[in-house]
Amino acid sequence: FSICFGDLLFFCTATIQGEENCMELQIYHSVNEGLYLWNGTSGLLIDGLHRGREIGFSDTSEQYICMMRQGRSFFAKPNDLLFTHIHEDHYDQALVDEFQQRYPGRIVYAPGLDKDNIQPVVLEHGIARMQIEEYEVYAFTTVHDGKIYEDEPHCSYLIRWKNRWIWVSGDAILVPELADRIRTYTGQDNVWKAFVMVYQISSESGKAFLKKLVPEQICLYHLPYPEDDRCHFCNLAEQKCRQCKAEGLPVKMIESDSFIDS
């Protein structure tokens, strides 16, 4: 009999807050841009099955793969998969295939993926809506950062659960006009958490986007485990977080393999 270390962490958290009556959305960050949203009855895994070590990021941990294969912890209840794009540090075809074999019928969606099993409803040019369990998901067609990637399919996501709005940037170029489009959907509500990566908070347009969006919390992700960080992304992230704080943007660098504070 084997058990994953993460099972204990998840069990304790769910027990303390009440798994059946969880009134608060919990978010767990694995590594790279992996996010797991849990509302007490169903989960949404975003960019969570991937590789990346060969390009200076990290592979999905063995702990996480163990949970998927044994149907434990995060994978003990219904889960669906969402991807911002299919670069290797976000998406691994072999792991996705294994997920679909073990959990047939669960939703898998990524822009440009020919195996999608959900059809988004187009609301306007560049914005489509999906209902995934209790999660209302708005897919914004965005442009991947970097000239060589600009023609590759990429989506950023605005996700609503009850009165909580979450913005998941992926690797998009962020511009102030995008914040205006997001606000047309959130209305008077604030974005609860906005997830951004280091290149976005390094650019003037990315910082202008955040100043216009005014999320309650700015979370910096897309960082590898320290042992995989051969490109020194973590040092750069710490430096950029300090610069943003000096400019009035309190960016929080979130830890890998941990729940994000409410």
Task: Label every model-predicted segment.
Residues H144-L213:
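Active-site-proximal loop/helix segments of hydrolase catalytic cores
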Residues M23-Q70, E150-D171:
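Conserved beta-strand hairpin/beta-sheet module of binuclear metal-dependent hydrolase folds
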Residues M68-M130:
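Active-site HxH/HxHxD metal-binding segment of metal-dependent hydrolases
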Residues Y28, Q119-I132, D151, L210-S262:
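Binuclear metal-ion centers of metallo-dependent hydrolases, dominated by the metallo-beta-lactamase
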Residues S42-L82, A94-D97, I173-Q188:
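Pre-active-site segment of Zn-dependent metallo-hydrolases
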Residues I46-D47, P78-D89, Y109-P111, W167-A172, ...:
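Active-site neighborhood of phospho(di)ester-bond hydrolases with catalytic His/Asp-centered motifs
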